[in-house]
Amino acid sequence: MTATAQQLEYLKNSIKSIQDYPKPGILFRDVTSLLEDPKAYALSIDLLVERYKNAGITKVVGTEARGFLFGAPVALGLGVGFVPVRKPGKLPRETISETYDLEYGTDQLEIHVDAIKPGDKVLVVDDLLATGGTIEATVKLIRRLGGEVADAAFIINLFDLGGEQRLEKQGITSYSLVPFPGH
């Protein structure tokens, strides 16, 4: 099933836009409204599974927290394992971490050291691509463990915030179902 214009429009219309959230001047794209619509949620998963079903993916990695909501069902659809990337202190076994910059400060992500094997072909899934900092850190974790990042897939791309370009500089192609301006 290749995504049709009608299907993509349905997904776009299922995502609510909230003015001045979380602060004045921001137009927030709320993917939780898509999750509330079982048809839209299933369609988003089905379209991603269809796109990657013959790509040789061996693992799907999702970033905390909404990346879990899309990455885990995509992994099931592809018949491969799902690997969560989390904030510090949330994973029980041995981890490695990667620090990345935020607008005002830094944050950190962790992955289990045994979650990715050398040669794994990995699809990174998250709900939204904005500046790309979180996904760039996720890619670095995967590569440190010997994994190959095949692609990064998103439900929403805030295309004017530079995330695609940032990932391209890391050699990562990205795919999104619904493009929106970032402001």
Swiss-Prot record:
Database matches in PROSITE patterns: PUR_PYR_PR_TRANSFER
Classification lineage: Bacteria, Pseudomonadati, Pseudomonadota, Gammaproteobacteria, Enterobacterales
Record-linked SUPFAM superfamilies: PRTase-like
GO function term, MF aspect, one: adenine phosphoribosyltransferase activity
Organism annotation: Escherichia coli (strain K12)
GO biological process per UniProt: adenine salvage; AMP salvage; purine ribonucleoside salvage
Broad class of the protein's primary localization: cytoplasm
Record-level GO cellular component terms: cytosol
EC number(s) from the headed UniProt entry: 2.4.2.7
Keyword presence, Transferase: yes
Protein name according to UniProt: Adenine phosphoribosyltransferase
Pathway noted in the entry: Purine metabolism; AMP biosynthesis via salvage pathway; AMP from adenine: step 1/1
